[in-house]
């Protein structure tokens, strides 16, 4: 039976009560915040296998240098079965600046994670081909970081 995005978000929260913040709905969209980024892969696998989020539409990152957890990663997931979209967010510190790759769960994560690595410097553990995608090897900066010299 098809579910609403709110129903699915509440199921996610019920399954991971200690690490998923209360889902936030705004204008028909639903955002779930993962409080423990070390468990990203486990949560993403549950979303794919148990809640039918079979497509990663987009992965991106936000640089907030004044926060202790400087980088926020944002994943836009889509369920073709339920016909709903869910946003999953988690934050990491600049050091070590690493998070699990989701490329083994969704093939679409491969190049998106490479782009985040190239432009923000975030490392994706267990990525099959983590190398720069836009800038050349040896380029000393990550152009989307706030301290990028203009």
Predicted stretch roles:
Residues 1-150:
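Terminal low-complexity/charged segments
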């Amino acid at each position: 039976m098809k579910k609403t995005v709110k129903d699915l978000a509440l199921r996610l929260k019920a399954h991971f009560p200690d690490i998923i913040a209360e889902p936030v709905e705004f204008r028909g969209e639903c955002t779930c915040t993962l409080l423990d980024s070390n468990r990203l892969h486990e949560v993403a696998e549950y979303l794919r296998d148990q809640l039918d989020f079979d497509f990663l539409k987009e992965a991106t990152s936000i640089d907030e240098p004044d926060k202790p957890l400087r980088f926020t990663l944002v994943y836009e997931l889509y369920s073709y079965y339920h016909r709903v979209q869910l946003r999953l967010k988690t934050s990491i510190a600049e050091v070590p600046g690493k998070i699990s790759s989701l490329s083994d769960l969704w093939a679409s994560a491969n190049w998106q994670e490479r782009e985040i690595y190239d432009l923000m410097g975030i490392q994706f553990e267990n990525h099959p081909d983590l190398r720069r995608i836009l800038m050349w090897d040896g380029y000393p900066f990550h152009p989307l970081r706030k301290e990028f010299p203009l």
